[in-house]
């Protein structure tokens, strides 16, 4: 008797952006363990190599490119095979009070967190690099509707990508291509240390969560596996919060 596994990714080719660290790295590694052929993208070739060294399988591929550069983006897409799954995970964070916002800060945040994934997805569709019945996952954030001081730019960028993804889900539904968003709360990655908060303060804050901890990249990876697998064949246009019980 065969083993029933509705979450297998065997036979699927999946692109993961932002795979050089954090959540993206965790997702890439997990997808490879579930049998997928994984293409990892990030700006730092050395860190992508570190991700590749932790992945399983011998048919994975690393494509370093700055997705905020339209030329580099188009060249990378041209190298892609047909995809069965895409995880848009590349992103940055920066805490700045509203009265101290600089236009350059806003442009950088929106370019990386919103424009780059939108234009990447556009180019993938234009070059017909995605298969029917594929799955697209955007890593957003509960910050979109959970305001905190100094987080206006980041919150707005994640709210924008969720709105885009919800529209994309409707447009691609006739081709059975599914589009969903994951909205994590605090996850232990390098990103959370860039807000000027100490590790001690973060460890004290995580005690406020009902499950008494922040999330780990693996927690987000496991949900991503579900959305990428055929087990989620009837799920599209959803925005899934994963928060350890926090609001």
Where are these regions (language model features)?
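Short C-terminal tail/terminal secondary-structure segment
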Residues: 2-5, 146, 225, 236-247
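Conserved glycine-rich cofactor-binding loop
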Residues: 20-22
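Substrate-binding pocket helix/loop in short-chain dehydrogenase/reductase
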Residues: 97-98, 105-110, 201, 205
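Active-site helix of classical SDR
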Residues: 121, 157, 165
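Alpha-helical segment proximal to the catalytic Tyr-Lys
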Residues: 126, 170-174, 233
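Residue(s) in the substrate-gating loop at a strand-loop-helix junction
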Residues: 141
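C-terminal substrate-recognition "lid" of short-chain dehydrogenase/reductases
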Residues: 213-242
């Amino acid at each position: 008797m065969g083993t029933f596994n509705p979450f297998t990714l065997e036979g699927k080719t999946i692109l993961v952006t932002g795979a050089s660290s954090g959540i993206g790295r965790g997702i890439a590694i997990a997808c490879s363990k579930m049998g997928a052929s994984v293409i990892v993208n990030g700006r730092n070739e050395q860190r992508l190599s570190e991700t590749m060294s932790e992945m399983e399988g011998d048919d994975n591929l690393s494509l370093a490119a700055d997705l905020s550069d339209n030329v580099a983006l188009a060249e990378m897409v041209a190298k892609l095979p047909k995809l069965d799954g895409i995880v848009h995970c590349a992103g940055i964070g920066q805490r700045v009070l509203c009265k101290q916002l600089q236009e350059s800060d806003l442009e950088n945040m929106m370019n990386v967190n919103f424009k780059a994934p939108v234009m990447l997805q556009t180019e993938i569709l234009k070059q017909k690099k995605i298969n029917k019945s594929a799955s697209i996952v955007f890593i957003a954030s509960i910050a979109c509707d959970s305001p905190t001081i100094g987080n206006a730019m980041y919150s707005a960028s994640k709210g924008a990508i969720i709105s885009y993804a919800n529209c994309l889900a409707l447009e691609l539904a006739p081709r059975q291509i599914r589009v969903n968003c994951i909205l994590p709360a605090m996850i232990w990655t390098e990103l959370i240390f860039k807000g000027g908060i100490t590790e001690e303060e973060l460890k004290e804050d995580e005690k406020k969560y009902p499950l008494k901890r922040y999330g780990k990249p693996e927690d987000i990876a496991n949900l991503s596996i579900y959305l990428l697998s055929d087990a989620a064949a009837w799920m599209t246009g959803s925005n899934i919060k994963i928060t350890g019980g926090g609001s």
